[in-house]
Amino acid sequence: MSFELPSLPYANDALAPYMSAETLDFHHGKHHQTYVTNLNNLLKDHELQSSSLEDIVVKASKDASMTGIFNNAGQHWNHILFWQCMKPNGGGPIPSELEGRLNNDFGSVEQFKEAFIQAGTTQFGSGWAWLAIDNGKLVVTKSPNASNPLVDGMKPILGCDVWEHSYYIDYRNKRPDYLKAFLDSLVNWEFVASQLD
């Protein structure tokens, strides 16, 4: 099986001013494409070449000899979710089922947002901030580099890339501002809610 770079579900200038066309051109067209190309090259004649992307991520995470496969498969999986988690004119009202779950598991939507921004801000170096389902409960977590909650048996439903290439053109070193803009103005809450099942 060969993996392909998915098309963005919006025009590359549609997320401005919160994420510029320049950022998307580099992030999607260069960085994400490189992960896909590297993954396909690493999987040639490999026992995992016909496995699903999710299976590759989980299996490669448990085997140090597959670090290259894990890094590129993880980044490919993470970015597929990341692109879907955003939309033009995002943010806004959260669907009632998801809002209820956030209120129940975090105390309030605002407390969830604070926890998410804190996770992304305190992720040292490159990585991701996540909202995931862990044994039926919504949790905020973070992961370094290409890792994600799948490797810990959780289901990620919202992910934000905190590698510098995801925000440095638009926000420079202001990662908290990027995370706030992501939650308030970019997130496709309908998509996130659809992942609850």
Model-predicted regions and their roles:
Residues M1-D197:
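Feature for soluble, non-membrane regions of globular proteins
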